[in-house]
């Protein structure tokens, strides 16, 4: 299928909310070897984030049920829940491995500018983070190191090449801070990164174009929400789940 046709079908699949189809079309487009435009890389991101988002949510529900049935000593439900959770986990790993393969084989090395490179390295950090959520033991440690390395490389480039209000730079800092808090168990680092990012963007807000204003201020609000949540947590109050960058 022609590249232009694949992109068109991915857009149709998005409108129909058939995200697995959308992801398959975008995967084929990436494998054609041409660099993606800004719109195309967003299509790729939205497709896979929706696919993996459903799997992550399902895995959390099943893990919670499994934990509860183990605590209750329920031999009736236990094996079935474990088996189904493992099935979802295998699917989730498969999607993450596919995305990481596309990033390493095509997208990162083909990125022609700093913004694209940061976008793809952030994506690499995100998909290693999703793998870390379901990993255990030595495997988890290796995956966490890979996520941290990708996020850090993206941060280094973004600080040199992009303004503090750039939505991609802000989204990267948001997700890296969530990684610090939820995966690496480093709440102080998470709070420090979120606060510094928010403060630097706030100081630079007057330079924002109308096009970027909505995207940037939305992510700044999420950074502030997380800071409120994490500060309450560290004060011993009941928190909740930290928001990360929105799907689209």
Swiss-Prot record:
Cell location: Cytoplasm; Nucleus; Secreted
RNA-binding as UniProt keyword: no
Induction of synthesis: Induced in damaged or stressed epidermis.
Site feature (Interaction with phosphoserine on interacting protein) residues: 56, 129
CDD domains from the UniProt entry: 14-3-3_sigma
Residues with the Phosphoserine modification: 5, 74, 248
A GO cellular-component term linked to this record: cytosol
UniProt-recorded Gene Ontology molecular function terms: identical protein binding; phosphoprotein binding; phosphoserine residue binding; protein kinase binding; protein sequestering activity
A Pfam entry, by short name: 14-3-3
PROSITE patterns, alphabetized: 1433_1, 1433_2
Keyword Secreted tagged: yes
InterPro entries to which the protein is assigned, alphabetical: 14-3-3, 14-3-3_CS, 14-3-3_dom_sf, 14-3-3_domain, 14-3-3_sigma
GO biological process, one term: establishment of skin barrier
Source superkingdom: Eukaryota
Post-translational modification: Ubiquitinated. Ubiquitination by RFFL induces proteasomal degradation and indirectly regulates p53/TP53 activation.
Protein family: Belongs to the 14-3-3 family.
Name of the featured protein: 14-3-3 protein sigma
Originating organism: Mus musculus (Mouse)
């Amino acid at each position: 299928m022609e590249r232009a046709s694949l992109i068109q079908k991915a857009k149709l699949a998005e409108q129909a909310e058939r995200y697995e189809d959308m992801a398959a079309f975008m995967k084929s487009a990436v494998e054609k070897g041409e660099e993606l435009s800004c719109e195309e890389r967003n299509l790729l991101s939205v497709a896979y984030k929706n696919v993996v988002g459903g799997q992550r949510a399902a895995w959390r529900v099943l893990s919670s049920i499994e934990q509860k049935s183990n605590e209750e000593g329920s031999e009736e439900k236990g094996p079935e829940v474990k088996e189904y959770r493992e099935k979802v986990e295998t699917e989730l790993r498969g999607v993450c491995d596919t995305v990481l393969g596309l990033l390493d084989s095509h997208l990162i090395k083909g990125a022609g500018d700093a913004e694209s490179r940061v976008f793809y390295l952030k994506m690499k950090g995100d998909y290693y983070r999703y793998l870390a959520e379901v990993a255990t033991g030595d495997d988890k440690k290796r995956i966490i190191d890979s996520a941290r390395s990708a996020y850090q490389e993206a941060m280094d480039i973004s600080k040199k090449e992009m303004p503090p209000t750039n939505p991609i730079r802000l989204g990267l800092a948001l997700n890296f801070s969530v990684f610090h808090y939820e995966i690496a168990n480093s709440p102080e680092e998470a709070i420090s990164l979120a606060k510094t990012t928010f403060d630097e963007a706030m100081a630079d807000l007057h330079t924002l174009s109308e096009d970027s204003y909505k995207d940037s201020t939305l992510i700044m609000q999420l950074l502030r929400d997380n800071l409120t949540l994490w500060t309450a947590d560290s004060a011993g109050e009941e928190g909740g789940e930290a928001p990360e960058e929105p799907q689209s």
